[in-house]
Amino acid sequence: MGIGRVTQVMGPVIDVRFEHNEVPKINNALVIDVPKEEGTIQLTLEVALQLGDDVVRTIAMDSTDGVQRGMDVKDTGKEISVPVGDETLGRVFNVLGETIDLKEEISDSVRRDPIHRQAPAFDELSTEVQILETGIKVVDLLAPYIKGGKIGLFGGAGVGKTVLIQELINNIAQEHGGISVFAGVGERTREGNDLYFEMSDSGVIKKTAMVFGQMNEPPGARMRVALSGLTMAEYFRDEQGQDVLLFIDNIFRFTQAGSEVSALLGRMPSAVGYQPTLATEMGQLQERITSTTKGSVTSIQAVFVPADDYTDPAPATAFAHLDATTNLERKLTEMGIYPAVDPLASTSRALEPSIVGQEHYEVARDVQSTLQKYRELQDIIAILGMDELSDEDKQTVERARRIQFFLSQNFHVAEQFTGQKGSYVPVKTTVANFKDILDGKYDHIPEDAFRLVGSMDDVIAKAKDMGVEV
C-alpha cells in the first residue's frame, strides 16, 4: 500500500501527494495517525478527486484538528466498509462501522461490505405490489405505502417528520416483526439518543441496526452515513432474503452535506448553490433502495423542505424517486391536527382500485373531493360567513370538518407529551369509518369529538363523555 504526504488542509478537505505509481483510486479509504492529547487517533479520509501531479483531494470522515502538512497518509487499498449481518442488530454505529454505544467492539471476524456498490441489475428487480399497513389513518386511507417501495415524508422545520418516522418504526417494526435499519443523517443527536432508549425499552432494538452521522459531524460523515446504513440493509435483503425496513432521517441533510463537500472540492455550484452532481448522487443512493426477487427494502425517508418551498432542487430531486409521498403542512399544525398530513397533496401510486380494492379507492376519492370542496368554499365563508351557503354546501362543510379532525390521531410515541394512549387503526376499520362519515351516519356528533382519536368507537366514547346522546 502506498504512503503519501499531506500537502494542504482546507477544513474537512485534505490534499495528499503520493509517489507516481502509487496514486490511490477514487473512493479508496486513506488513514492518518493524528496525535491528540488523549493519544493517537486514526483519521479516515476518502479519495474524491485525482488532481494530477500525483495529488489526490480527499474528504475527512471526522474532525481534521491536529492534521499538519507533511504528515504521512497510508492508502488502505480498499473502500470504506461496514460490518453486516446479525451481529449488527441491537447496535449503534458511526459512518465507518465503528460501534458508538459503549458496548463491546464488533469482532474482526465479522464480514464487512464496502459502502459503494452497484444498484441491483434490472432483471433482479421485483415488480409485485403489496400494501404495507401502518395503522395511521390518513396514510392508509389516502396515500398507502407499498411494501418494498420508497416513501418520502416531506415537511418544513418542526412540523412532525421525526415523530411520524418514530411512530412508523413503532407500528411497522412491531407489527411487521422484521429487521429494521435506521440511518440518522445530519439530524439532532438528542433525537437519536431518545430513539435508541425508546427502542431499547420496547424491545424493537433487538431487530434494529442504527447508524448515525449527526449534525455536529463533518460533511464527509453526513454524506456517507446513508450509504453505510443502506449497505447493512442490502446484506439482509440479498444474503438472508429478508424484508427489511430502512428509515432515513433526513435525506435532505445528505444533499446538504454533498453541497458543502462539492464547494470545498472546487466544483462550480448549480441552481440555488447546490452541487452540480445533485441528481447523480441522489440517484446512486435511491436506485440501491429497491426490492429484488430475493427480498425487499422498504424505505421511509424524512425530507426537510427548506422554507416550505417544494420547488427547491433538493426535495424536488427526491420526489422523482418515490412511490408514495406524505406531505406535512404547517397550517394543520396551527389548527392542532396531528399528524399534520396534507390529505390533498399527499400521493401514492398504490391508490388504484386494482391494488387497494374498489371500496377503499372510492372512499378515499370521496374524502379528497369533500375536502377539496371545503377548501374552495373557505374564501366564501371568510367573506360572507356560513349563513350565505346553500344547505348542501353547509352539509359538505360540516362533514369535511369532521373528516379533517378524524384524520388526526394519537401516537404511541407522543404519549408522554399528550397523556393520551396511542392508537393503531387497521385499514378495514379506517375505510368503514370514513364511509360512515361520508354517508352522514355521524352528523349528530359534535366535530370536537373527532379530534385526536383512533377509530369511531373512540369518537362515540368521547361524545358520551361530552354529554351527547349517541
UniProtKB/Swiss-Prot annotation:
Listed EC numbers: 7.1.2.2
Binding site for ATP: 155-162
Record-linked CDD domains: ATP-synt_F1_beta_C, ATP-synt_F1_beta_N, F1-ATPase_beta_CD
Catalytic activity: ATP + H2O + 4 H(+)(in) = ADP + phosphate + 5 H(+)(out)
Membrane-topology descriptor: Peripheral membrane protein
Stated family: Belongs to the ATPase alpha/beta chains family.
Protein name: ATP synthase subunit beta
